[in-house]
Amino acid sequence: MNEKDLLTRWEERIPDADEPSYMLLMALCAVSSHTAALEAVFDKTLLEDLAIPDSKQYFTEAVSKIPARFSAPQDFDYLRSFGLLTVYALQSGNNNDLHRYLGMYHALVAEYGFHDESRWPDDISLSEVDDRRRLFWCVYRLEIHSSCVFGHTVRLPEAQVSVYYPRITPTMDPETQAWTIGWDYITDVFRLLEYAIFGLRACKNRKALLAVLCDRPSPTMLLDSLAQLKASKSRTLTRLHDPDSEFYSNRCRYMAVQISCIETTTTIMALLYCQAPARDVMAVAEKFLKKLSSAPLIMFKIASSQIVHQLLGVGHMLSNASRYDNDQYRTEAKRLIAFLGDLVKSLESVVPAAGSAGDKLLRLAEANT
């Protein structure tokens, strides 16, 4: 939701319980209270003297309002609600709920063509067009993330999508413009990550007649596309770490961490797809870990389970890479995975999923002995 809508939407009244807007409000409260309970906010004064309700109550209330049949299926609030319920499930570590509500979201997308802007209502405002674009790509990124981490299929490949990115307008302040530029860049990297996933997982026993119609991208093409994307990165994004920059806000600094994580994940997956030398994979991981270890703790709090999932994925990819080149990099892989495990384990007090993920990484490190 855009900030203005968020501030004014429910200012005057709470909607009736049978309205889609009420379901959206409850889903939003579930995600917000879960975040507040973890103190995953940049300004802790917002939580002072605040009794934080149980997020499960809001979640249960939102779920109870899902209709058996959608009388107004084009209502944008249903799509927003399912997106937020999916986020809540991911944050809570409930994969069953994640697939349930992501599936409901995709059911509405499929039935009413949300993946194609030409099928959207003609009478919506430019502001709602941008909101719809933002929601679509946010859920797309969430699905690619969960597909990468949990191994499920990508339900809506980007090749079948006809949705633009939200507009960058002259009325935006410089910080918001920088954030939007970064948001677009991250989405581009996720779209490349989808092809890396496809390259690594593509069906190996497809009939020859069909195989020629759905060739995987060549390894060099994938790496070249990633290199071109990085090379064309806006100069604005290179200034997010500069304390003297007008873009040195909390959310832009957090975005810089996000960019580093998704670039590393995509690069390593592309290298694995190319069967690149293990030393190349280790070098990328080492550079990433040095940068990540200097990030403030609050950035990990804000990222929550998503960054833990990504770090666990990096550990598994390092383990796979260590088997190349006659196992000569197993010792190096063990060192890096153990470092990852210790880093993730240290987040246990602020990210609930970190404890078990850290243990998995440490066991994985020992397995590489």
Predicted region positions:
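Transcriptional activation interfaces
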Residues: M1-E19, D54-E61, V109, V189, ...
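Fungal C-terminal regulatory tails
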Residues: S162, Y195-N205, T236-R239, Y254, ...
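Residue at a conserved register position within TPR or TPR-like alpha-solenoid repeats
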Residues: A89, S147, M269-L271, L318
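TPR repeat positional signature
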Residues: L24-L25, C29, D77-Y78, F82, ...
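Structural signature of alpha-solenoid helical repeat junctions
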Residues: P20, L24, Q74-D77, S127-D131, ...
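Fungal transcription factor middle regulatory core
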Residues: A110, F114-S118, D123-A227, K290
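C-terminal transcriptional activation/regulatory domains of eukaryotic transcription factors
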Residues: M1-N94, P174-Q177, T238-A256, C274-A276, ...
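Cytosolic regulatory protein-protein interaction regions
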Residues: A211-K291, N320
